[in-house]
């Protein structure tokens, strides 16, 4: 019992360290350095901005949207989402491994997707949340208690479909299987993911792949278990489900083979859902891009063909730098594959990528046509 008490006390201190005085903050950072390898602590203003977003993100979001998110960006994004939905339906119709019965169920689910773009239609009001200039720690306690009460108040009530799981400034996107919705906060609708004035190759290769990725989550190893209404229910024929699992096993083996650090490999099972999302998403985005005027042309821009610009735009999204310690931690805990493997994992299975860059037998990333995997 005494050991359990000590453990619980330690957890409280560890969870609260960032809200306490400097010695606690420094001790917490020193502990995290061992896991992440981070040499210098994130500047205080960035840490406070992140915490503010986490506590009152929709208040902060209103300011962010007013300053940085233009109406034309939302309109352009809605157009992209609609075009990718059309492309996805075409791809479902053309699948050679799925029966007509399961195809229809898949299309029903696709048609039922609810897209959310930029910011909520109804802003959270934070009524009853007490924030003062007297105590940072108490503010965070109050915020935690308020959030808990808000969640409990939703019990036994109809689902509020106006709520968002991310704040507007968030640079991310998500798919919710129980809501069957795809959500794109304003924060991700900027370079390198999106630019309203950019050519189609750039936008379809970047944010288009993200849109397709989130759509594909509705049909990955987890999302595929939910129907169009968000109910956990099997809608596959026995034969189609077996074929789907066989294909995902091949994708898992592909990522298992990637060596990240010494003997540490990517975990193909842990990252399965995200890898299915990447493979499906890039294919759907490319299908949609080829329906545009630029996608059907051969005109070069800055010396690159439309198809090359599409794939280069996808690649640029995954530029980054990560310390070995953080990379090792990611491999063991994160369902996302490291960026350097996400950037090659999907294209090596696409005939269009080989044609765009004239990839031939003997080249490092070459895969035989019969070994290139197509799921969605």
Model-derived features with residue positions:
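Noncatalytic, helix-rich "gating/capping" subdomain that lines the substrate-entry/channel surface
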Residues: 1-79, 83
